[in-house]
Amino acid sequence: MNTQEIIEALAMLREKKPLVVNITNYVVMNNTANALLALGASPIMAHSQQEMAEMMSFSGALVINIGTLDSVWTPRMHFAVEQANLNNKVVVLDPVGCGASQLRTQTARQIAEAANTLIIRGNASEIIALAGENAQSKGVDALDSSDSALGAACYVAQQYQCSVVISGETDYVVTKEAQYKLNNGHAMMPFVTGMGCTHTALTGAFAAIGDHSGVAATAVLGVAGEIAAEQSAGPGSLQINLLDTLYQLDEETLMNRLKLTVNA
């Protein structure tokens, strides 16, 4: 995927306004729903198993975020993945805090194993832990650099036959065909809770219109976050400015600002 294809994907997303089913955490529901709306997608936060078969029959993609995981949520997540598979829909998994507890690590691996078409989006420590290596994390925050997770991402991509997105100071996307390096974003972004969860939700929106790599969402959020941070005094205003920037983001801005390197 190149810059022009990312621009075309954004235009298609805004035209089609895909419905994205989110089983996500309590902390970020408002953030991620607003980000999806600002970009042009249609979010629904559906957590009931009783309606999931219907939801997956007409939605574009399924986003699963294990940020506030518990025994009530887990069977719902597994059932949702089953329904996504039955309807040939992409599953986007955010393994929040993978490596911080056995519950999170095991659940993330089980979901990844179950999904037929999968994108995994996490920080470096989460991806390293998912691969079964020793990671440095503090709760859900990464202490590993994104560069250090590249080997783990390649392993995870092979293990689960999926695309892997590593968020960090530098973002990486690993697919079967290529590795992508993206150098946008801003150092202020990690000070807003749920920024990675927003990244995952946007990945679901682009997956719903055909980008099964995660590259388009990574590019769009990186450029939008960079611009929004330049206009912000701190994390509070960054949250608001990010929504405005996602809404206003255009072809010329992406073309001029995106820093994308592709290694095929």
Curated annotation (Swiss-Prot):
Keywords: ATP-binding, Kinase, Magnesium, Metal-binding, Nucleotide-binding, Thiamine biosynthesis, Transferase. Substrate binds at M45, G194. The keyword Metal-binding applies. It is an enzyme of class 2 (transferase). GO terms for biological process: thiamine biosynthetic process; thiamine diphosphate biosynthetic process. One of its GO terms (molecular function) is magnesium ion binding. InterPro entries: Hyethyz_kinase, Ribokinase-like. Gene3D superfamilies: 3.40.1190.20. ATP binds at R121, S167. CDD domains: THZ_kinase. It comes from the Bacteria. It catalyses: 5-(2-hydroxyethyl)-4-methylthiazole + ATP = 4-methyl-5-(2-phosphooxyethyl)-thiazole + ADP + H(+). Pathway: Cofactor biosynthesis; thiamine diphosphate biosynthesis; 4-methyl-5-(2-phosphoethyl)-thiazole from 5-(2-hydroxyethyl)-4-methylthiazole: step 1/1. Its EC number is 2.7.1.50. Its cofactor is Mg(2+). Catalyzes the phosphorylation of the hydroxyl group of 4-methyl-5-beta-hydroxyethylthiazole (THZ). Belongs to the Thz kinase family. This is Hydroxyethylthiazole kinase. It comes from Aliivibrio salmonicida (strain LFI1238) (Vibrio salmonicida (strain LFI1238)). The lineage of its organism: Bacteria, Pseudomonadati, Pseudomonadota, Gammaproteobacteria, Vibrionales. The gene is thiM.
